[in-house]
């Protein structure tokens, strides 16, 4: 632990839970901190599960609804190790949010923003918490929600302390997959909040080189690229011989039409395996899949759906395979979903020493990065994917890119270098 680092108050949407990959980025960035130097504000009614940070303030959106009808309802509270989670409230909120995410209607986003517009979250408890933790720096996670940007702006004004912003998705440009006039209106107001937050920040962190290029120009800043870092101190590249059947694995969500990519990959594998079992694809996902669709993908026995494994078992599963698949939809309807983003899984895949097979449109940040770094087998179309997989030199390609990917990770995502950059940036901000 480094006692000389400044105290940081982190503002993020979801609960900090180290058992889930979604929280791995925060834990990765701040794991060298003394937990007493960190505090966190979040808006999910769940108990944190992390050893990285001990001090939390939770804003309950269900309580915000109740406050409309009963104004003295408490909407936020400090969370510590003795806190007992309100199961009924947590389940109610989780059920509500799962429904909203499943339906993906802009109407629910609008209702959520209206709820926050009542400002019931600006509680005396929140003000007391911020005063108590007295941070040196505010760390604001970027968000595609106006409400989260409003929360971050409010806290920065409350503390009058310097702050940095970490953008992981394109929250600013008008490049939206589905045309909807209401979404454009929403984006207009989101842009105003994002612009104010970034323009007044001491440092902007971004997730990908493509985002840096665009946002530096838009906001006239010199942003710093920050990805999940990998500890290479005990890692060394171990070459492996590829033998048939080649074992491929996909691990992750299949939302945003990623399932269609896996379906096409499965069809190509089925065609190849007509003359004998040459490739096997394993899929691990937490998402529900219609049984009819699942049956159509697996009917020839070349693709298998597996029960999801805990986050700490992911490395073991990858080690058992030759190729790890990273997929984004090739459907133009979804072309902007990952346009500037960079999945935390990519750094894990590169560090695994296994070949990465990346499938997706050529103009999005992950594909551009892997192509420019020559760190993966990159297929920007199904025809290109088929050419790679039917080629006689596929085993040689896999062995070659397993090494290239590993050393790309060592060069660009070494945790030692990233930790040093973040720590130096934090110290510089405080000294300004």
Which ranges hold each PLM region?
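N-terminal subdomain of nucleotide-sugar transferases
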Residues: 1-83, 223, 231, 270-273
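A short, active-site helix/loop in glycosyltransferases that binds the activated sugar's phosphate group
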Residues: 44-45, 194-223, 422
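Membrane-proximal helix-turn-helix segments that form the acceptor-binding/catalytic region
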Residues: 124-128, 150-158, 171, 184-204
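Carbohydrate-associated surface elements
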Residues: 210, 228-229
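Conserved donor-binding/catalytic core segment of Leloir-type glycosyltransferases
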Residues: 241-262, 266-269
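Nucleotide-sugar-dependent
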Residues: 257-260, 314, 324-347, 356-368
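Nucleotide-activated donor-binding/catalytic signature segment of Leloir-type glycosyltransferases, i.e.
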Residues: 285, 291-320
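A charged, aromatic-enriched C-terminal amphipathic alpha-helix characteristic of glycosyltransferases
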Residues: 380-427
């Amino acid at each position: 632990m480094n006692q000389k680092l400044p105290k940081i108050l982190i503002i993020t949407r979801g609960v900090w839970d180290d058992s889930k990959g979604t929280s791995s980025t925060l834990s990765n960035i701040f794991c060298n901190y003394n937990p007493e130097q960190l505090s966190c504000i979040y808006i999910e009614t769940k108990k944190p599960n992390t050893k990285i940070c001990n001090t939390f303030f939770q804003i309950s959106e269900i309580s915000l609804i109740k406050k409309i009808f009963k104004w003295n309802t408490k909407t936020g509270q400090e969370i510590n190790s003795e806190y007992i989670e309100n199961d009924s409230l947590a389940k109610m909120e989780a059920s509500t949010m799962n429904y909203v995410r499943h339906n993906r209607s802009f109407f629910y986003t609008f209702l959520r923003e209206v709820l926050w517009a009542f400002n019931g979250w600006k509680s005396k408890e929140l003000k007391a918490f911020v005063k108590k933790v007295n941070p040196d720096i505010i760390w604001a996670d970027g968000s595609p929600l106006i409400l989260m940007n409003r929360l971050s702006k409010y806290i920065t004004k409350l503390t009058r302390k310097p702050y940095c912003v970490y953008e992981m998705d394109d929250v600013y440009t008008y490049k939206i997959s589905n045309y909807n006039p209401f979404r454009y209106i929403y984006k207009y107001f989101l842009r105003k909040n994002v612009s104010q937050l970034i323009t007044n920040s001491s440092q902007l962190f971004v997730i990908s080189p493509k985002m840096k290029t665009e946002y530096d120009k838009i906001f006239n800043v010199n942003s710093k690229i920050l990805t999940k870092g990998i500890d290479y101190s005990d890692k060394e590249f171990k070459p492996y011989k590829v033998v048939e059947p080649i074992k491929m694995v996909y691990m992750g969500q299949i939302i945003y039409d990623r399932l269609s990519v896996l379906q096409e990959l499965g069809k190509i594998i089925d065609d190849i395996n007509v003359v004998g079992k040459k490739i096997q694809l394993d899929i691990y996902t937490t998402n529900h899949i219609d049984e009819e669709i699942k049956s159509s993908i697996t009917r020839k026995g070349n693709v298998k759906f597996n029960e999801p494994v805990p986050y700490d078992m992911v490395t073991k599963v990858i080690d058992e395979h030759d190729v790890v698949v990273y997929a984004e939809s090739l459907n133009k309807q979804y072309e902007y979903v990952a346009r500037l983003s960079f999945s935390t899984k990519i750094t894990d895949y590169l560090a695994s020493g296994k070949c990465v097979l990346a499938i997706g449109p050529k103009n999005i940040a992950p594909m551009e990065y892997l192509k420019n770094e020559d760190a993966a087998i990159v297929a920007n179309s199904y025809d290109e994917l088929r050419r790679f997989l039917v080629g006689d030199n596929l085993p040689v390609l896999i062995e070659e890119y397993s090494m290239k990917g590993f050393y790309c990770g060592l060069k660009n995502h070494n945790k030692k270098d990233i930790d040093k950059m973040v720590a130096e940036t934090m110290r510089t901000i405080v000294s300004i």
